From Swiss-Prot:
The lineage of its organism: Bacteria, Pseudomonadati, Pseudomonadota, Gammaproteobacteria, Thiotrichales. This is Trigger factor. The gene is tig. Gene3D superfamilies: 3.10.50.40, Trigger factor ribosome-binding domain, Trigger factor, C-terminal domain. GO terms for molecular function: peptidyl-prolyl cis-trans isomerase activity; protein folding chaperone; ribosome binding. It comes from Francisella tularensis subsp. mediasiatica (strain FSC147). Keywords: Cell cycle, Cell division, Chaperone, Cytoplasm, Isomerase, Rotamase.
């Protein structure tokens, strides 16, 4: 086999590979003879079909099957010999004739080689959130609202009321697509509508019609409406007032708590603290990763981005429960491309840093992290034992420990400031970030 490096520029490289004719023809001949012993053909007994007839009828097909098997073997050997770190490969067949050498080009995308420097340029705003009894009481109030019952009343609309409305949205005086609805239930103050919409209904009566003006958010998914000033013609058809359940032993049992109200409040606070800790860690880590992407200079392999896009599509399909009749591959790649590119770049950067720095996940550190994570489950010890039996889960935990250590290492060199934030705003932002990332 002869290998010629045709060109090598950045992360792109082409290998011209030539396989001697006798090697190809020998394998093809053996395959034809093997096929002749098993194939059924009219006029011949099984195993007695002449090799010449098999070659005449199936020779091209057999040759292509042989080549399809042989090409990956040959380019894998060439890549190994040339000591190339390959991210993606495309094969272009050049010459394929009996009695002639097989020639093909392996167009490669290589993993970029780079070193990250300038960690002191990274700026991180570390959120500081105080969790007090006030936030715990508000969380319990939110849980009460989830179990609220509603009854129709004759009064003006107030916060927390459920209203049934019709509305027509207009932009520049013309109704826009998706802006009209009938018999829609809205809980005032829930934030299910765009900012300003629910506030505009407060004070209205049953049967009243009113036109309000609202501006769509800058990050609204429909770009034609983002930041647009619009009007909504609203008709209130029904007003229902919420009745919240009393916080007692019966109420807390709905959440699987057996120790009464005091135990319930303690568990709520512990859950809030645990959730807050992981969210704040994630916020800091996201800023660190963003900073790393800004200071690192390298070309990102498109094949890795494509692979990540495909994985994101399959993950979305899994979240949808398999969705029969829905072809996730019909979704455009650009819907996933930005997140995919970020994930690939972050992974490459972390690998680059870890090649120079030794970060290890000690067994005790993995155990400690696991203990924290399982507390969110109903049966922590049982869940812990199940996870410990799963090698993939343990590998993920080790990777997370190392990722946390790397993040702390970068933070020691970065510019870190603190910013006080509200607990519920942090939770809301986290939910929005998760939704944006599918």
């Amino acid at each position: 086999m002869q290998v010629t490096v045709e060109k090598k520029e950045g992360i792109h490289c082409s290998l011209l590979i030539e396989v001697p004719a006798n090697e190809i023809d020998s394998v093809v001949s053996k395959e034809i003879n093997r096929t002749a012993k098993t194939i059924k053909m009219d006029g011949f007994r099984p195993g007695k079909v002449p090799a010449g007839m098999v070659k005449k009828k199936y020779g091209e097909q057999i040759r292509m099957e042989v080549i399809s098997d042989l090409i990956p073997q040959k380019y894998s050997k060439a890549i190994q010999d040339e000591k190339l770190a390959v991210a993606g490969i495309e094969v272009e067949l050049k010459e394929n004739k009996e009695g002639q050498p097989l020639k093909f080009v392996a167009n490669l995308e290589l993993f970029p080689e780079f070193e990250v420097t300038g960690f002191e340029k990274i700026e991180v705003q570390k959120p500081v959130v105080e969790l007090t009894d006030k936030e715990v009481k508000q969380m319990i109030e939110n849980l009460r609202k989830q179990f609220a019952t509603f009854s129709e009343v004759d009064k003006v609309v107030e916060k927390d009321d459920k209203v049934t409305i019709d509305f027509v949205g207009k932009k520049d005086g013309e109704a826009f697509e998706g802006g009209t609805a009938n018999d829609i239930d809205v809980i005032i103050g829930s934030g299910q509508m765009i900012p300003g919409f629910e506030d505009g209904i407060i004070g209205m009566k049953k049967g009243e019609q009113k036109t309000i003006t609202v501006t769509f958010p800058q990050d609204y998914q429909n770009k034609d409406l983002a930041e647009a000033e619009t009007t909504f013609d609203i008709t209130v058809k029904k007003i229902q007032q919420a009745e919240l359940p009393e916080v007692n032993d019966e109420f807390v049992k709905k959440f699987g708590v057996k120790g009464g109200v005091d135990t319930f409040e303690n568990e709520i606070k512990e859950n809030m603290q645990r959730e807050l800790k992981f969210i704040l860690q994630r916020k800091v880590k996201d800023q660190v990763f963003k900073g790393l992407r800004e200071i690192a200079e390298f070309e990102t392999p498109k094949s890795l981005i494509k692979r990540e896009i495909d994985a994101a599509k399959q993950n979305l399909l899994k979240q949808m429960g398999g969705a029969k009749g829905f072809d996730v591959n019909q979704l455009p790649d650009n819907l996933f491309e930005a997140n995919a590119k970020q994930k690939v770049e972050t992974s490459l950067i972390l690998d680059s840093i870890m090649n120079l720095q030794e970060f290890k996940a000690e067994e005790a550190e993995v155990e400690s992290l696991l203990d924290e994570l399982v507390q969110a489950y109903e049966e922590p010890e049982k869940t812990k034992e199940q996870i410990k039996k799963n090698d993939k889960e343990i590998a993920n935990l080790k990777a997370l420990v190392i990722e946390n250590k790397l993040t702390d290492w970068v933070l020691e060199q970065a510019k870190v400031t603190e910013k006080t934030e509200d607990f519920f705003e942090v939770i809301k932002e986290n939910m929005q970030a998760q939704q944006a990332g599918f």
